[in-house]
């Protein structure tokens, strides 16, 4: 390399008078840029060139293709990294030049003289104070993460704030469903005080095997069937108090009731799960344990209802939410055989929207509350399907006189 005069690049700094403008017009190439702008414009994607650079704009240090503003100057990635390492590791005091500090620095010679390259960096205006040491870099990274989390929280709050709540028509729909539930839900909120526990002696009777491998305690089965008729009647009364349901043809009403009856009764039992006594309260009057319900005819369906009761405890549902779940289960358009499918779909959609908007109004603290609650509707549909299969086995194995007429009317001829 030949010694040369200390001629500076024509793009050398003329001072730090103004910050970099928001548009790509500029009078000088090395004007001061705020830390925020530099951070936003830093190159993180290989080959990415910021829009504010002119086409093939050169690095003011070596003339290679520039990639953006780095430490207050337009430079290439190589000179940016060289300058950062030099400052962070305090290497510049050890740099020396064989040619008295007069080397020309370009993209071919830049790696041959560290001192002249560093001097060129300084002379064109690269700022040493903008290079962060390890502690400052960690602090900056932490601040970036904190700001990112803060933006996420603010976005979540904004999202919650714009979630729609019920309009006037939906409030009326919600009111009618809630009233229908309260008027057909025996004992109301005082069910714990009025319930009666099924005697532990129930279950000592001879067990009758069924064709699906389970066994049935006929005494327990008899006790359960006694409360089935009033429980079914209450579900029917609930449905009839909903104007949308009453407007459907009688044939469709029957199909919907036969399909949802076990699902709604299971929901009403599940929301009255008591973790202290580990019991469900059936029809708001009889508290039963898991094994009693299982041996009394429900088999594995008993496990599903008890598990649902445990899970629903964390949701802290109020009467309105239980009522709207029942309305959604009732208005299931996928029950086969009904005539007015489109109208039933519209009814279910109306209840679903009112339900979702009411959930927004309640502002539960559980993340993703609405989709999690909808999964419980799916669980109830599965319970209904399992019970339909279980009923077929029970009807074959248990004495016909144990089945109340309304019980048979509702659960016979169901889809399995």
Curated annotation (Swiss-Prot):
According to the UniProt entry, which residue ranges have a biased composition of type Polar residues?
1-13
GO BP annotation list = cell differentiation; negative regulation of transcription by RNA polymerase II; positive regulation of transcription by RNA polymerase II; retinoic acid receptor signaling pathway; thyroid hormone receptor signaling pathway
Q: Does the keyword Zinc apply?
A: yes
Basic and acidic residues compositional bias: what residue ranges? 15-24
Q: Does this UniProt record's set of keywords contain Zinc-finger? A: yes
SUPFAM superfamilies the UniProt entry points to: Glucocorticoid receptor-like (DNA-binding domain), Nuclear receptor ligand-binding domain
Segments carrying the region annotation (Modulating) are 1-58
Ranges of residues in domain NR LBD: 169-413
Ranges for region Disordered: 1-37
* Pfam families hit by this protein: Hormone_recep, zf-C4
Zinc finger (NR C4-type) residue ranges?
59-79, 97-121
Q: Which UniProt keywords apply?
A: DNA-binding, Metal-binding, Nucleus, Receptor, Transcription, Transcription regulation, Zinc, Zinc-finger
Q: Which GO terms describe its cellular component?
A: RNA polymerase II transcription regulator complex
Matching Gene3D superfamilies: Erythroid Transcription Factor GATA-1, subunit A (3.30.50.10), Retinoid X Receptor (1.10.565.10)
DNA-binding region in chain numbering: 59-126
Under the GO molecular function aspect, what terms does this record hold?
nuclear receptor activity; RNA polymerase II cis-regulatory region sequence-specific DNA binding; zinc ion binding
Instruction: Determine the domain of life of the protein's source.
Output: Eukaryota
- Enumerate the subcellular locations listed in this protein's record, separating them with semicolons: Nucleus
User: For this UniProt entry, what is the primary localization, expressed as one broad class?
Assistant: nucleus
Q: What is written about domains in the entry's comments?
A: Composed of three domains: a modulating N-terminal domain, a DNA-binding domain and a C-terminal ligand-binding domain.
Function (record text): High affinity receptor for triiodothyronine.
Q: Which family does it belong to?
A: Belongs to the nuclear hormone receptor family. NR1 subfamily.
Q: What is this protein called?
A: Thyroid hormone receptor alpha-A
This protein's species is Paralichthys olivaceus
């Amino acid at each position: 390399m030949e010694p040369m005069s200390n001629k500076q690049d024509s793009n050398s700094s003329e001072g730090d008078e103004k910050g970099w403008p928001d548009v790509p017009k500029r009078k000088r190439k090395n004007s001061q840029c705020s830390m925020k702008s530099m951070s936003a414009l830093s190159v993180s994607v290989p080959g990415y060139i910021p829009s504010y650079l002119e086409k093939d704009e050169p690095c003011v240090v070596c003339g290679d293709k520039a990639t953006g503003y780095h430490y207050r100057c337009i430079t290439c990635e190589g000179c940016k990294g060289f300058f950062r390492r030099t400052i962070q590791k305090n290497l510049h005091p050890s740099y020396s030049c064989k040619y008295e500090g007069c080397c020309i620095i370009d993209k071919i010679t830049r790696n041959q003289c560290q001192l002249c390259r560093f001097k060129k960096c300084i002379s064109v205006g690269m700022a040493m104070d903008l290079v962060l040491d390890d502690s400052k870099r960690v602090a900056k990274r932490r601040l970036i993460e904190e700001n990112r989390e803060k933006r996420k929280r603010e976005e979540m709050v904004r999202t919650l704030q714009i979630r729609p709540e019920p309009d006037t028509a939906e409030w009326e729909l919600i009111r009618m469903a809630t009233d229908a539930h309260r008027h057909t839900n025996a004992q109301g909120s005082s069910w714990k005080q009025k319930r009666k526990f099924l005697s532990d002696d129930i279950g000592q009777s001879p067990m009758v095997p069924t064709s699906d491998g389970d066994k049935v305690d006929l005494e327990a089965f008899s006790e359960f069937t006694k409360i089935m008729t009033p429980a079914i009647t209450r579900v029917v009364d609930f449905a009839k108090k909903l104007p949308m349901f009453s407007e459907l043809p009688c044939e469709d009403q029957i199909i919907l009731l036969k399909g949802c009856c076990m699902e709604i009764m299971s929901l009403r039992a599940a929301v009255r799960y008591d973790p202290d006594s580990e019991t469900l309260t059936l029809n708001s009057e009889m508290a039963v344990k898991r094994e009693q319900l299982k041996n009394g005819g429900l088999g594995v369906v008993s496990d599903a209802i008890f598990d649902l009761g445990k899970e629903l405890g964390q949701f802290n549902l109020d009467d309105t939410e239980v009522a709207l779940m029942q309305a959604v289960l009732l208005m299931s358009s996928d029950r086969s055989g009904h005539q007015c499918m489109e109208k039933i779909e519209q009814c279910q959609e109306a209840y679903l929207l009112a339900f979702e908007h009411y959930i927004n109004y309640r502002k539960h603290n559980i993340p993703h509350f609405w989709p999690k609650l909808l999964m419980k509707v799916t669980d109830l549909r599965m319970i209904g399907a399992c019970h339909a299969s279980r009923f077929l086995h029970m009807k074959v194995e248990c004495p016909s006189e144990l089945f109340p007429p309304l019980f048979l009317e509702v659960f016979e001829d169901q889809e399995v």
